[in-house]
Amino acid sequence: PLNLKNSTWTLHDDSADSQQLSKDGTAPYSGPMTYQINMDIQEPSDDEKATVRIGETRMRGEGEGLNDLSQAQVWTYPVDRLSGEAAGEATLSHTLATPSDTVTVDGYWLKFPADAEKTNYPVFDPTLRKAVDAVFEEETTMDGRTVYRYHQEIEPTNVAQLFAADGNTTSLPKEGGGEEQGYLTHSGSRDFYVDQQTGLVVGMDMDIDDYYADREGVGRERAFVFNGSTSEEDQQALLKEAAEFPRDRVAEIVRWGAIGLGALLALLGIIGALGLFGGKNKHARSRHNRGRIGGSAVPASR
């Protein structure tokens, strides 16, 4: 089987916003954050499917220890080895000492179909736990390889209306005293840079504006505001891996083997029965859509 050595997508934002847990509850955090995805693909059990484990982490500051950990979760599910499409439900571990969730993974995520086409693909959004179309935008070349860029636009969506989970609601202060319920609202966009031949995602831009809104949908408090792109190092490594896919095997079936987890994913052993949780911007993008506080898009104050 083909062994891929690199399976890490690291995105960094020097001025992100999130919520930080403390003994007194939660408090706003503004500063550097790193969002990282690590993918571990197990040895395939048959000729058609493999099991993937995808760990997501959000780290504050330098991300050097568990105290900097903002969020972590791991998804485990079967995929079609050629298309990359989910072939069954996922087990999601996200909170210490709580049962895992069962989630239907729609569409694709980090692996598009081999011989990708200039069309729209449904791509899984882990915050919404459902797919949102990614629209073909352009063909480009990276390190001599043909790469397609697909753009995914996420309209403001009340996540609490989709499923119940920690963090989907909060308490917001009311004018004149008292509190009211706040609802996590997810919005933003992603751009996926996909190696056309193999379907491997070799780069990603992410501009996320998550906030807590009142019953009328007016943004009141930032939850996770982040703008970053895949690090240069990760992108180069992923392009190299794509280039090493045997051409004849891609035409038949992409034989995914074991992909080593990144060091950060190893930290996630404190969560769930799985024993796992779960740079600089090359494609810098504007923050024009950040900080939807007060019901309109306004620049996030720093």
Name each model feature, range by range.
Residues 10, 34-36, 51, 76, ...:
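Ser/Thr- (and often Asn-) enriched beta-sheet segments in non-cytosolic proteins
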Residues 196-243:
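Extended, hydrophilic extramembrane loops/domains of integral membrane proteins
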Residues 109-205, 210:
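Membrane-proximal low-complexity regions enriched in glycine and acidic/polar residues
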Residues 167-170, 214, 219, 262, ...:
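Solvent-exposed, non-transmembrane amphipathic alpha-helical segments
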Residues 161-162, 216, 301:
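Short conserved micro-motifs at the rims of enzyme active sites and ligand-binding pockets
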Residues 1-115, 229-249, 275-281:
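Extracellular or lumenal secretory-pathway regions
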Residues 247-302:
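Juxtamembrane interface at the cytosolic side of transmembrane helices
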